[in-house]
Design a protein with these regions (language model features):
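ABC ATP-binding cassette signature C-motif
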Residues: 1-261, 312, 316-643
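Intracellular alpha-helical coupling/juxtamembrane segments of multi-pass membrane proteins
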Residues: 251-276, 280-306
Length: 643
């Protein structure tokens, strides 16, 4: 269906891809993996035509259509949710008009035996078949099913898209993409803004999809459940494994062991050859042999091996100072923001050593409860009491903003590290993807993802006894997540984690608190015990179990009406937040254009220009910073407006 032939992508003197070839077949389910910066997103952009290779070619089956979901995109703000989603059927609407026109024309003809009449019938049949393939006759039901599957409520359908936060807007774009039914989906981190329920629904959708799927994800469970083939990008090459991710990990370890053996043998041969050359370089009787050995080294194809995996590093949190047995006591706690009721009736106790997951749809109150325990928010109902001698380490989405921008990456850790751990700072930074010259970068030039990883690395150096981690794995690759998970499992303190990553939570937590329909429910077991209890196997079951709650929920939140002044203040705040989001979006659009200009420039460049690359990296860092600000502003807007 799509053939990539000898693709090379070079930027000045640096080669990202070196003669990569790959064939994507109809109905393939491919997971694209590799270290951050290996070129996974670039490969998707090449396939979709947003970027051109330095050399090589990409060929497509004539009928191939592509549906591409990048990591960041924005939705128009001039329509309702349903109207925006229905844009997925633009081609269907054109077909409807063509079918109506052809039907009228055929009805008016009487030349039943003519070739023109036969041609009209043929075109009508083709248009009708295509209409059915694209789901034209079931589009309203498909829109509803897809939006519900991705976590929207029926009460959201007529809301303006401008009222939704950044994460929910990404879901709108994903819904449109799924409804277009292209020949192949190219999905870049599709689970980033989804909760566990929506991820499971998307898994089922993709497993049963009639086309091909090529996706990038750091969610191991998602990859295992969707893909049957894994392509690894490493050192400019593509390694194709006809197996799901977990099996690929085993085969990759075997391949790496073989590579290392070959690499070490070659290094020994090179060392002996260089010793011979140095020893006999100036002896006339050996000159022919010396020249022969020099040519041998020049012709030698050097074996490259990717840096050693860091997942085996034994990185630990410092021992937790002993706290009281009761770490936190939550009694009938609840939170509302103006007319927006988030949750109520939370009633549970967190004890020393507990490892707890907070799960549920976005906006149901997981982060709100975390901030209440930390003390950043005061409950509007009930109470929260933190126990004796509890020292909280809190990792949140904006935690990295608290770091000094003028410190280097290494200094940021060195200033809080004490004891023997100071000798291992480079290993710790490496575990969180900071290597080589990265450790000397100033914090202010780091991307949002890099700052988030640095904040987590710093958290691992300080002696807390209660860790509250809000989506800690968002900017991590598989190996970094494994390191963090192992460290948490060995940690002797108390842990509360907000996460939608099932593989990360599996085996790590022993209690799950689900935020749903304005309440909090406790499950005494791990994440898969919770999922089994909830039986989230299909959208039909989710709808059946939740139908009464969905009808009752509006009644519970409508008991307290706002005064005129309160409404006025809320509208004022909403205008301010929407303006902030619009301003940041305009800045992002400008930055995207400048970055795209540099991408084109580098693609055409024949010489390396250090000043251009410096400016390019500064633009990307600013883009990441602005995207982070956009996510924060969108979250505030979501909380204020309500879902």
């Amino acid at each position: 269906m799509i053939s990539l032939d000898n693709l090379t992508v070079s930027y000045g003197g640096w080669t990202l891809f070196d003669n990569i070839s790959l064939l994507i077949n109809p109905k393939d389910r491919i997971g694209l993996v590799g270290k951050n910066g290996a070129g996974k997103t670039t490969l998707l952009r090449l396939i979709v035509g947003e970027q051109q290779p330095t050399s090589g070619s990409i060929s497509y089956n004539g009928e191939c259509t592509i549906g591409y979901l990048p990591q960041q995109m924005r939705v128009a703000d001039t329509t309702t949710l349903v109207e925006e989603t229905a844009k997925a059927f633009d081609e269907v609407l054109k077909l409807e008009a063509e079918i109506a026109r052809l039907t009228r024309e055929i009805a008016e003809r009487t030349d039943y035996e003519s070739s023109d009449y036969e041609l009209l019938l043929h075109r009508l049949n083709e248009a009708t078949d295509h209409y059915h393939i694209l789901g034209g006759d079931t589009r309203e039901a498909d829109i509803e099913k897809t939006l519900l599957g991705l976590g929207f409520k029926r009460s959201d359908f007529q809301r303006a898209t401008s009222e939704f936060s950044g994460g929910w807007r990404m879901r709108i774009e994903l819904a449109k993409l799924l409804l277009r039914r292209p020949s192949i989906f190219l999905l870049d981190e599709p689970t980033n803004h989804l909760d566990i329920e929506s991820i499971q629904w998307l898994e089922d959708y993709l497993k049963n999809y009639n086309g091909a799927v090529l996706l990038i994800s750091h969610d191991r469970a998602f990859l295992d459940n969707v893909t049957t083939r894994t392509v690894e990008i490493s050192l400019g090459k593509a390694y194709d494994y006809k197996v799901p991710y977990s099996r690929y990990v085993v085969l990759r370890a075997e391949r790496r062991a073989q590579q290392m053996a070959a690499y070490e043998n070659q290094q020994r041969m090179i060392e002996k050859t260089e010793e011979f050359i140095e020893k006999f370089r100036y002896k006339p009787t050996k000159s022919n042999q010396v020249q022969s050995r020099i040519k041998q080294l020049d012709r030698l194809e050097r074996i490259e091996v990717e840096e050693e995996d860091l997942a085996t590093l034994n990185i630990k949190f410092p021992p937790a100072p002993r706290s009281g047995q009761i770490v936190a006591e939550i009694k009938e706690a609840g939170m509302s923001f103006g007319s927006k009721h988030v949750f109520s009736g939370a009633n549970f106790t967190i004890e020393r050593g507990d490892k707890i997951a907070l799960v549920g749809r976005n906006g149901e109150g997981k982060t709100t409860l975390a901030r209440m325990i930390v003390g950043q928010l005061t409950p509007t109902e009930g109470s929260i009491r933190v126990g004796a001698n509890v020292n909280i380490g809190y990792y949140a989405q904006n935690q990295e903003d608290l770091m000094n921008g003028d410190f280097t990456v290494y200094d940021t850790l060195d200033r809080v590290a004490v004891g023997d751990v100071r000798t291992r700072l480079r290993d710790i930074l490496g575990a969180f993807l900071f290597r080589g010259e990265d450790i000397d970068k100033k914090v202010k030039v780091l991307s949002g993802g890099e700052r988030a990883r640095l904040a987590m690395a710093r958290l691992m150096l300080e002696p807390y006894n209660l860790l509250i981690l809000d989506e800690p794995t968002n900017h991590m690759d598989m190996r970094s997540k494994d390191i963090l998970k192992n460290a948490i499992m060995k940690y002797d303190g108390t842990v509360i984690v907000v996460s939608h990553d099932r593989e990360f939570l599996d085996g790590m937590v022993s209690k799950v608190y689900e935020f749903r329909n304005g309440g909090v429910r406790e499950y005494l077991g791990g994440i898969y015990y919770f999922l089994e209890k909830r039986k989230l196997e299909s959208l039909q079951e989710v709808e059946r179990k939740d139908a009464p709650a969905k009808e009752a929920a509006p009644k519970a939140s409508s008991s307290g009406k706002l005064t005129y002044e309160q409404k006025k203040e809320q509208e004022k705040l909403l205008r301010k937040l929407r303006k902030a989001v619009e301003t940041i979006e305009a800045s992002l659009a400008d930055l995207e254009k400048k970055i795209a200009d540099y991408d084109r420039k580098f693609a055409e460049a024949t010489q390396y220009n250090e000043a251009d690359y410096k400016a390019y990296n500064e633009l990307k860092a600013e883009y990441d910073h602005q995207m982070h600000e956009w996510e924060k502003a969108s979250y505030e807007l979501e909380i204020t407006e309500g879902e």
